[in-house]
Structure formats: structure tokens, C-alpha cells
């Protein structure tokens, strides 16, 4: 009987200790946000214009392998990547970790062989997704 009481007490203690570990943790996408601004240059009919600057806020870095950034102009969606193999290239400026977008770090999005914004006053819709979850931020910017 004493063995059963001891076992019962051990199970209850384990449940109490582990209960704090079992609740749902808030995701990085819920605690990270970004701000978007028009980049300094003007939109032209060229294919190498720097369009936007995005700055990450929050406490966590976003791994580039789990981060998906897309721009939309009209009905056309443009995927952005670090490699420049996509129509939109991500240029990381001031972070220390080349594998992640860090809080406080600004990145620039520029055309990479595709004319995304032909002329000034181009409306660009921005989507930043981390690990399948949409980040909160400026969703639409006018590029001049």
C-alpha cells in the first residue's frame, strides 16, 4: 500500500512539474513584426531597382530557410530570395548572422532581372511568412 502511495505521489509530482512545459508556446511569427519603407531610389523600367527596405522587430531571429518573402504588384506575385535566382533579391545589410534575419536588421528588396515596378507610384503588397505563419507588418507600400 505504501508503494502505491509513493507511486501515486511521484506521478502527481511529475504531472505538476511537466504541466508548465505542455502549454502551447507562442510562435516567433506572433512576437516578430516588420516595418517597410520605400527605398531611396526611384522605380524605373530597368530590372535592378532597389524597391523596399524592411526592418525586423522582436526578440527572435528568423532563419532564412524558414522565411518566405513575396511581393505582389497587380495580379503578379514575385518570390524574393537571397540568391538572386528569383525575380526579387534580398540584400541583408547590417546583421551579424548570414543565416538569419535578426531583430533590428534592415534588409533591402530589389529587382533581380525582372521589372517589378515600371514607374513611380507603384503599389507593392508585401507578404512575410515565417515557418508557415504570417508576420505582422506593413502590408502595402507605394514605391516612388
Model-predicted regions and their roles:
Residues 113, 133-144:
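Edge beta-strands of extracellular beta-sandwich domains
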Residues 1-31, 52:
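Secretory targeting signatures
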Residues 75-81, 135-137:
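Surface-exposed loop/edge segments in extracytoplasmic proteins
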Residues 71, 128-129:
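Short aromatic-centered micro-motifs
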Residues 27-76:
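Short, surface-exposed binding/anchoring microloops in extracellular/periplasmic proteins
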Residues 83-123, 129-131:
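Short, solvent-exposed, Trp/other aromatic-anchored flexible loops in extracytoplasmic proteins
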Residues 30-41, 82-94:
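Generic structural motif
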Residues 35, 108-110, 142:
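Generic structural detector for well-ordered beta-strands
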Amino acid at each position: 500500500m505504501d508503494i502505491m502511495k509513493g507511486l501515486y505521489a511521484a506521478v502527481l509530482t511529475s504531472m505538476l512539474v511537466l504541466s508548465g512545459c505542455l502549454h502551447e508556446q507562442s510562435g516567433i511569427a506572433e512576437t516578430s513584426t516588420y516595418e517597410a519603407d520605400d527605398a531611396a531610389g526611384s522605380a524605373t523600367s530597368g530590372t535592378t531597382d532597389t524597391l523596399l527596405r524592411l526592418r525586423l522587430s522582436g526578440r527572435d531571429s528568423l532563419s532564412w530557410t524558414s522565411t518566405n518573402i513575396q511581393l505582389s504588384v497587380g495580379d503578379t506575385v514575385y518570390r524574393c530570395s537571397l540568391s538572386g535566382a528569383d525575380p526579387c533579391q534580398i540584400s541583408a545589410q547590417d546583421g551579424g548572422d548570414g543565416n538569419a534575419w535578426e531583430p533590428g536588421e534592415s534588409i533591402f528588396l530589389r529587382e533581380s532581372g525582372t521589372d517589378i515596378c515600371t514607374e513611380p507610384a507603384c503599389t507593392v503588397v508585401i507578404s512575410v511568412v515565417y515557418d508557415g505563419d504570417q508576420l505582422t507588418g506593413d502590408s502595402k507600400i507605394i514605391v516612388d
